[in-house]
Design a protein with these regions (language model features):
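Short acidic/polar hinge/loop motifs at secondary-structure boundaries
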Residues: 103-131
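N-terminal periplasmic accessory domains that precede
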Residues: 60-64, 83-86, 95-98, 114-120, ...
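Periplasmic-side early beta-strands and strand-to-turn transitions of outer-membrane beta-barrels
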Residues: 136, 148, 156-157, 165, ...
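N-terminal periplasmic "start-of-domain" segments of outer-membrane beta-barrel proteins
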Residues: 25-55, 84, 92
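Extracytoplasmic beta-strand/coil segments of soluble accessory domains associated
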Residues: 61, 65-103, 125
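Boundary at the C-terminal end of the N-terminal hydrophobic targeting segment
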Residues: 18-20
């Protein structure tokens, strides 16, 4: 059983202009501050919430593999097996992964590893893929680029959502979420359960490779004033 818990707590300094007008498509990864995609010189692709929601795939790695050119997504077997992403043909150690601005790639390993096999799309709002050398911004582990994932935030009012999907091999996914936004604060709580009886990864073998994944995402944000925002994140995967 694999258990991963990420807890994030930090302050964000935001330019007041970010609140004064709405930009149709913005990116953060290209310069670490919100900016219009049309002004970015780097090769950046944004997979928005609508694309994630309408995808037939359950996992982030599979969605990136289907939607992007110039990447190599590999997996050693069925659901839950070791997987990784290469950008522009470079070894995967040169692609750094961030979740809500916090580095998720394991710096303690020589290969700067991050495995996408347990990363379900249900609680994420968008993904930014920045291709090309980004060492000046993100260090030597980003020679091929970065992949940044941003979790969902609370919407106006108080909202409850449930989504149930079912497929072959007794595959089913349940997404539950609660979110809200009022005055200066917003929150989001999302839980996803994914289960499948699976199929054998070996030829001429009837033994099924079953898999189960439970993930929990929580975040809370508070706008202290026009320039400062406090955010707390928790990401749990079992």
């Amino acid at each position: 059983m694999m258990l991963r818990v990420l807890v994030f707590f930090y302050f964000i300094l935001v330019s007041s202009s970010a609140f004064s007008k709405e930009i149709p498509v913005i990116v953060i990864s290209a310069g670490k501050t919100p900016q219009s995609k049309s002004t970015v010189g780097s090769d950046v692709t944004v997979i928005d919430s609508k694309t994630l929601r309408n995808s037939n795939e359950f996992f982030i790695g599979d969605i990136l593999d289907n939607k992007l050119n110039g990447i190599n997504y590999f997996q050693s077997g069925g659901y839950g097996t070791v997987s990784g992403i290469q950008l522009r043909g470079q070894p995967k150690r040169y692609t750094t992964v961030y979740i809500d601005g916090v580095k998720a790639s394991d710096p303690s390993t020589p290969s700067n590893d991050y495995y996408f096999n347990n990363l379900i799309s249900g609680s994420f709002d968008r993904v930014e893929v920045l291709k090309g050398a980004q060492s000046s911004l993100y260090g030597s582990g980003a020679l091929a680029g970065t992949i940044q994932l941003f979790s969902k935030k609370g919407r106006d009012g108080h909202n409850n959502d449930i989504n149930v999907s079912k497929g072959s091999f007794d595959t089913r996914k349940v997404d539950l979420s609660f979110d809200g936004k009022e005055n200066n604060y917003d929150y989001f709580v999302g839980f996803t359960n994914f289960e499948t009886a699976g199929e054998s990864a070996m030829r001429d073998n009837d033994e099924k490779d079953g898999y189960r994944n439970d993930s929990l995402t929580m975040n809370y944000g508070y706008n202290i004033n026009e320039n400062f925002r406090l955010e707390n994140y928790l990401y749990y995967n079992d």
